[in-house]
Amino acid sequence: MGTTYDIATKQSEPGQDSRAPAVVVEQLRKSYGRLKVLDGISLSVNPGATLAVLGRSGTGKSVLLRLIIGLETPDSGSICIHGQNIVGLALDQMGEIRKRMGFLFQHAALYDSLTVAENVAFPFVHHRKAMSGSERINRVNQLLAEVGMEGSQGKMPSDISGGMQKRVGLARALALEPEILLLDEPTAGLDPISSGEIDDLILKLQHERQMAFIVVTHDLHGAKTIANRLALLDQGNVVIEGTYEDLQKCDIEFVKEFLKQS
């Protein structure tokens, strides 16, 4: 089963240019035993645009991100990154593709035994071996400044708040200058003020970097703030994809109920 309700009108905002989509997912299916998680999902996002993927817990939102970044393999369907289907690629080829993508895990996933600076430098150590120590330090400082975490280089993850950990995770995700940024519940577990600050930071990065963003979230308020388009998932399918205004106009009962409860 594919998309149930499709919005034909596309936003004439960022990402609606002559460039090909950064990410195209077509008829993606994924099951774990008898549990069908994704059942024919099709989505796309252009360079410079942001797609927010919404839905209740267990609808496959995070699984979708793991498939896009190549951490899991779909049962069927295709995932094209800048026109190249990554399904079935060899590990070394997938490694090269993954360098073009940044990923922020739901819980920031910082290394507890490393300082903030060491966490942000981690991608450089493993993927930019020719970079000198001074270059690495300068780049780490620039990235931390970009996410508003100046002066935190020597702190441990346990020394900073959840919102700050998300910022450091974002800095690390940006280290290799990705063309695509995947964010898994970037405001989960944060208070409203911290959530708003993360949303503001995402908007800032959108403006400055013009990447393609895919954001998985439960937070409808944040989603409509940061995203050009929203996709609502249920039972492994896209129920509706469009602008927030499109969702408000939709007469599907599930969509109405989701908006009411969010």
Provide a role label for each language-model segment:
Residues A175-E179:
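A short, proline-enriched helix->beta-strand linker immediately N-terminal to the Walker B motif
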Residues I69:
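Helix-to-loop junction immediately C-terminal to a conserved catalytic motif
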Residues L181-D184:
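Catalytic Walker B motif of ABC-type/P-loop ATPase nucleotide-binding domains
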Residues Q84-N85, G133-S152, L203:
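Conserved ABC ATPase "signature" region
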Residues M156-I160, M164:
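Conserved ABC ATPase signature
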Residues L114-F122:
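Short coil-to-helix segment of the ABC ATPase nucleotide-binding domain corresponding to the Q-loop/switch region
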